[in-house]
Amino acid sequence: MPSDSLATPDAVAVDTAGTSATKQQQILDAVLAVLARDGISGVSMRAVARQAGVALGLMNYYFADKTSLIAAALRRLGDQDAQLVEPQEGLPPREQLVRSLHRVVGDEFLSGDYLALRLQLWALAPVDPLFASINQEAQERYRDGLAQLVALASPHLAPEEAAQRAADILVVQNGLWLTSMLIADRDAIDRSVRRCEEIALAP
């Protein structure tokens, strides 16, 4: 009878997949750290491998080149943005919307490192059509998620109106992040959030 301590092929496959995903996330964390610290010019396969503490050969196993590496990092940031506007079970729609509007000005999103990273990633849009496409897709995905929250909080709104409000809020939020890189003004940030609430919850 086989020992319980022996891993089945399926268990080994799951463990291998988990390790692979962890390594890739470790590498993407390193890409974002290098981008925030050194800008796009500082990103290389070797620099990211050093930051991640992995062998260069492992980098090349997961990512073909610098472009694919940065593209993956952009997509990851887009996923994180989308999570900010995901509906949360158990909360009234209005509260979900208000919480989402406040989450974007949490300390983690107003730190110097994060704002520098955000600026670097946005600056990639004119550099390469692939980066532009990923950036645009991420912005649209966030905007559409926000429009859904607006619609849930105000069911009487036409879909077009909810979408327009989400688009207007996105402009304010992006401007907030950019300005916060240059001027640390908490009062202005709080007013901007209140303005977003007014846009979202207008009758």
What is each PLM-predicted segment?
Residues M1-A11, R143, L152, T179-P203:
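C-terminal peripheral helix-coil segments that are non-catalytic and often amphipathic
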Residues M1-T22, A33:
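N-terminal intrinsically disordered/low-complexity leader segments
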Residues Q26, A30-S68, A72:
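Helix-turn-helix
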Residues G39, L124-P129:
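Short loop-to-helix capping motifs
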Residues R75-D81:
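Short, basic, alpha-helical segments at the C-terminal edge of helix-turn-helix-like DNA-binding modules
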Residues V85-L115, A163-I169:
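Hydrophobic alpha-helical connector segments
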Residues E86-Q88, L110-L119, P129-S154, R194, ...:
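Amphipathic alpha-helical packing segments from all-alpha helical-bundle domains
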Residues A116, Q120-W122, P159-L182, I189-I199:
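Hydrophobic alpha-helical segments that form the core
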